[in-house]
């Protein structure tokens, strides 16, 4: 009897271990491959100059000194950051184990040479970010030499001097324009690019991009994904439909913009996630036909008064994206007063509208831009009787244009550096912005995205980036 019991216990124990082994084996068999989709467009993979959703690829392939997170930064290529009491001098001490994907060492001198190369060769608007460095803008405009620029190297430390104090300069350097570069990349095919991020390109075709782990990445041991497979699809609806068919793990920014006419459906799905970003929408006034009336500050203030960013966030984007500045839904009293004030200014200036409608421009095939623009233009037409035509035809003289910009830091006031650079203003505070209105501010965009539950470690940073190296599939 004892022998029988012993045999029974042995059999049961073996079965239990076998089941445990099966579960372990099953867990190990989970494919660490992340599937998503991006637009079918031209990709150059150049941190100095990129377009559209290309930033989503650059942040996987390249790495800067820091990564932006909800509060402050994560140190990645540096072991420490120091700054002077007045925040004008910054010292970045780099890791000693940094390498390019081809094994070549990365040092502080690599960053110094890369930043100078960007000042010499970048034709992107993003180069303005470097202009906060002492002497950088003059060097960019070929007025001085390298010795006048506030960048130098001591041992493996990158020492940066700024024109003015910037308390969050460690956030600024998380943006791609500050990434290190390899000059050879200009002559290399996309699948041969030399990179320093967690992934590198293993295959690039017209229909698919495949990324694989970079074995020379300093933190490769913590990169769980083996591959990233990105389908390239031109049509937004077709790309979106890949998610409910389980062909992809994730859909949305920063890889693909959510199609506007699918937002209603998206909001009913349990896989929906919403993340705040530092992307800001506004309406600029290029005024290419030189109508002095639209340069009148009081007119611009009235145009801003009747706008309704709250409506845009709640009804158009459907995710409560907030107004850039506190701006409640305009009441009928506010609208009526704005209308009266507008007519007084118009009459006093003896101005008559053009017989040809003024052009309000949005990008071709961008339905979200069109809806956001229309929601404001209809108020300008309704309250002020301004003849305006909303179109994506850029051949006509543009008077108004809807635009957005990704600040890439946690400080909304950093938007003013871009506004000052692009529109020639000198704004330093919210009060100055609202008193001068170089553009009509609208809202801060929140991103609505879709992710299946098997994707763990997913997070959109305030700059709208996703670092896939932190993701694993379960």
PLM regions: where:
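Ligand/substrate-recognition segments at binding pockets and active sites
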Residues: 206, 345-407, 447
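Surface-exposed binding/hinge segments that line
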Residues: 127-183
């Amino acid at each position: 009897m004892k022998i029988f019991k012993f045999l029974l216990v042995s059999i049961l124990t073996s079965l239990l271990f076998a089941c445990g082994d099966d579960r372990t084996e099953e867990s190990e068999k989970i494919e660490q491959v992340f599937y998503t989709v991006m637009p079918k467009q031209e990709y150059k993979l150049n941190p100095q100059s990129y377009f559209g959703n290309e930033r989503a690829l650059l942040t996987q392939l390249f790495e800067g000194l820091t990564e932006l997170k909800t509060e402050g930064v994560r140190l990645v290529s540096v072991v420490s950051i120091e700054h002077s009491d007045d925040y004008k001098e910054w010292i970045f001490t780099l890791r000693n184990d940094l390498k390019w994907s081809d094994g070549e060492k990365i040092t502080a001198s690599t960053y110094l040479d890369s930043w100078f190369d960007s000042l010499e060769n970048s034709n992107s608007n993003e180069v303005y970010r470097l202009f906060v460095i002492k002497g950088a803008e003059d060097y960019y405009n070929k007025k001085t030499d390298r010795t006048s620029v506030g960048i130098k190297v001591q041992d493996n430390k990158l020492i940066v001097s700024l024109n003015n104090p910037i308390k969050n300069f460690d956030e600024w350097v998380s943006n791609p324009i500050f990434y290190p570069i390899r000059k050879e990349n200009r002559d290399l095919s996309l699948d041969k690019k030399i990179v320093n991020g967690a992934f590198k390109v293993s295959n690039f075709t017209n229909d698919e991009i495949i990324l694989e782990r970079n074995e020379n990445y300093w933190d490769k041991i913590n990169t769980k994904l083996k591959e990233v497979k990105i389908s390239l699809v031109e049509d937004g609806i077709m790309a979106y439909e890949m998610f409910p068919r389980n062909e992809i793990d994730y859909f949305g920014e920063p890889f693909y913009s959510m199609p506007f006419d699918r937002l209603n459906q998206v909001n009913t799905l349990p896989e929906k996630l919403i993340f705040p970003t530092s992307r800001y929408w506004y309406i600029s006034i290029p005024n290419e036909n030189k109508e002095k009336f639209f340069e009148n500050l009081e007119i611009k203030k009235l145009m801003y008064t009747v706008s309704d960013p709250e409506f845009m966030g709640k009804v158009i984007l459907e995710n409560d994206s907030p107004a850039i500045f506190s701006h409640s839904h305009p009441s009928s009293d506010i609208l009526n007063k704005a209308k009266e004030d507008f007519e007084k200014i118009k009459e006093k200036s003896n101005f008559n509208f053009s017989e040809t409608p003024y052009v309000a421009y949005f990008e071709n095939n961008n339905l979200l831009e069109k809806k956001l623009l229309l929601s404001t233009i209809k108020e300008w037409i309704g309250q002020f009787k301004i003849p305006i035509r909303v179109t994506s035809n850029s051949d006509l003289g543009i008077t108004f244009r809807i635009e957005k910009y990704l600040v890439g830091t946690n400080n909304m006031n950093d938007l003013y550096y871009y506004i000052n650079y692009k529109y020639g203003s000198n704004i330093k505070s919210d009060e100055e912005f609202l008193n001068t209105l170089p553009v009509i501010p609208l809202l801060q965009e929140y991103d609505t995205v879709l992710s299946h539950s098997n994707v763990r470690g997913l997070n959109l940073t305030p700059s709208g980036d996703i670092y896939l190296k932190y993701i694993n599939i379960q």
